[in-house]
């Protein structure tokens, strides 16, 4: 059995009973972990979970019981610089697209996922439909940034007082006064996050709100058609294009294509129309018998909702059949 080491001090009143009254396994390091990290080269901890000061020569000033991060030996795969972005625009957009399975805590790829697991809306591109129409059909599921407030900061409030008060059309952001700046000099300068009130009157340009971005200037894919779904080289955004619903496995699926169908690009629509024409010609030439393309045998398809063969889960006719709907038991 692997030994465990915990450097947390014992409670003088509880002693060893503290492990049972208030168990804390945050700083427990097993010998098996060191073996997997050093010998098998496994990455057991994320970079955000390890205390960066604990691996320095000076060490962390906080004891392990008070530090919110883990004091453990990192693996060789930890603290590696991120790989450079690919040169192809489609592959680059794929690396910048947030993994939809990661948002639902269902991604099993981990660091090997081809999509990013760093979800920060302010680093995402601006949603062109929200800028142009003032709303987005995806709402909270949209992975692009919705700039709801494009007002500038009130320069008078930053100086110390605004006569308009809450009726001011500009933003009032409360900041604490920088003690070093009030004393005469702040070494951080413009990078300081505290307030640096200026005695001079602000210029007239500081009261003007920024110009909203032009939707025509965006060359990236819209929210319903991100990179990784469809062909980037053959895709051109057209706001007047007709959206055609398609199956989830057809080229050009949207963010919700895995559950409610996707969207076909122009090439996919052209190919589908050509297939329909060929099917019609084949049906007329063979006495009315229709010759379609390859079709999956439904007798081999198992519905994960009702556990019966013969249909897909999105076309399940047994809506009221009890059982393991969606594999909930397996996830437990």
Swiss-Prot record:
Any GO BP: mRNA processing
Zinc finger motifs (C3H1-type), residue ranges: 45-74, 93-120, 121-147, 148-175, 149-174, 177-199
Protein name: mRNA 3'-end-processing protein YTH1
Localisation: Nucleus
GO molecular function, one term: RNA binding
tRNA processing listed as a keyword: no
Family the UniProt entry places it in: Belongs to the CPSF4/YTH1 family.
Region (Disordered): 269-293
Main function: Component of the cleavage factor I (CF I) involved in pre-mRNA 3'-end processing.
Record has GTP-binding as a keyword: no
Superkingdom per UniProt: Eukaryota
Keyword tags: Metal-binding, mRNA processing, Nucleus, Repeat, RNA-binding, Zinc, Zinc-finger
Zinc finger (CCHC-type): 301-318
Gene Ontology cellular-component annotations: nucleus
